[in-house]
């Protein structure tokens, strides 16, 4: 088994606390609303949203994958940090054992924020992660962030 790390940062004009509330704490409801082309539904299969919770994210028809199951590993409301692992579905299977993700939202000097993402791909056997796979996953994450950002800009009273 190998572990391949990937880190990225994406700026946002939305303040960290507001972005964390919308994107992380209420993302299960908000993402299918603002990005239905990317997320059809999110349901809690087990747990209350805190560590140990298992969520099933279903993707729209025509997506490369039907669904993923994620386990919530950490929700830090003070430091705006969220960690979760993809444990089933999606790319997890023959080549990947799991994908561990950490999202941290930090304040930016301009009043906005910076979304810091860390991914650890745990491969099976001697499988490797190629750069194209990582690029696709980053583009998806940025797309979701921008959809939430657009919603928040259009709804200035939401998630304050």
UniProtKB/Swiss-Prot annotation:
Transmembrane ranges, per UniProt, are none
Tell whether Glycosyltransferase is among the UniProt keywords.
Answer: no
| Gene Ontology, cellular component aspect | cytoplasm; nucleus
- Would you kindly state one Gene Ontology biological process term found in this protein's UniProt entry? abscisic acid-activated signaling pathway
Q: What Pfam families does this protein's entry cite? A: Bet_v_1 (PF00407)
What molecular function does GO assign, one term?
Answer: abscisic acid binding
Question: InterPro entries under this entry?
Answer: Bet_v_I/MLP, Bet_v_I_allergen, Plant_def-hormone_signal, START-like_dom_sf
Keywords attached to this Swiss-Prot or TrEMBL record, sorted alphabetically, are:
Allergen, Pathogenesis-related protein, Plant defense
Give the protein family: Belongs to the BetVI family.
Q: What is this protein called?
A: Major pollen allergen Aln g 1
What is the scientific name of the source organism?
A: Alnus glutinosa (European alder)
């Amino acid at each position: 088994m190998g572990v391949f790390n990937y880190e990225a940062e994406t700026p946002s004009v939305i303040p960290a606390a507001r972005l964390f509330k919308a994107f992380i704490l209420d993302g299960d409801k908000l993402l299918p609303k603002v990005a239905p082309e990317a997320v059809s539904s999110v349901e809690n299969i087990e747990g209350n949203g805190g560590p140990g919770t298992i969520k099933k994210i279903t993707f729209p028809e025509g997506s490369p994958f039907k669904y993923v199951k994620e386990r919530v590993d950490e929700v830090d409301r003070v430091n705006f940090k969220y960690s979760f692992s993809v444990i089933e579905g999606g790319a997890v299977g023959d080549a990947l054992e799991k994908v561990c993700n950490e999202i941290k939202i930090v304040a930016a000097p301009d009043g906005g924020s910076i979304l810091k993402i860390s991914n650890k791909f745990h491969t099976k056997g001697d499988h490797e992660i190629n750069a194209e796979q990582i690029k696709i996953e980053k583009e998806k994450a940025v797309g979701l962030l921008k959809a939430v950002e657009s919603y928040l800009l259009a709804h200035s009273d939401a998630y304050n």
